[in-house]
Amino acid sequence: MPTLRMPNINQVALSGRLVQEPDFRFMDNGAARLRGRIAVNRSYRDRNQEWQEETSFFDIILWQKAAETLAKRLHKGTPVFITGRLQSHSWRDSDDQPRFRVQVQVRNLQVLERDAEDMQEENVQQETALQAA
């Protein structure tokens, strides 16, 4: 009887909004890195058939040319669609406590169109910042 091989699949696709300003920097080895976090909302009906909202947060990371190119376009509130793979990290912190993190290594990122209300709010914020300067 042939051995059944399970495929190794590690793919993720998410759409959401950046919840903070991304952190762009060059690493000691010269690699460009962009880190951020997105919020993904899910609506569902509970047992009483009432609509509920659930929000999940995911750390994302981009490298090299993609990081450099998107660093100026991505800001808090930017809607994005990403595809990539999950990568886990474990370490011990300064108190010798075990820590664990899963982040999305982004392969493709598409900035989604903002709706008119978002654009109007951003324009008001930009105008306010200019007036304050």
PLM regions with names:
Residues 1-10, 24-29, 45-50, 72, ...:
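Acidic, gly/ser/pro-rich intrinsically disordered tails
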Residues 13-18, 38, 76-88, 106-109:
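OB-fold and OB-like beta-barrel modules that bind single-stranded nucleic acids
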Residues 63-99, 112-115:
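Beta-rich strand-turn-strand
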Residues 98-99, 103-108:
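A contiguous, mid-protein "functional segment" used to position or interact
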Residues 33-35, 57, 106:
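Hydrophobic residues on conserved beta-strands that form the core of alpha/beta folds
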Residues 46-72:
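A beta-strand/beta-hairpin structural motif
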Residues 7, 53-55, 104:
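ABC ATPase A-loop
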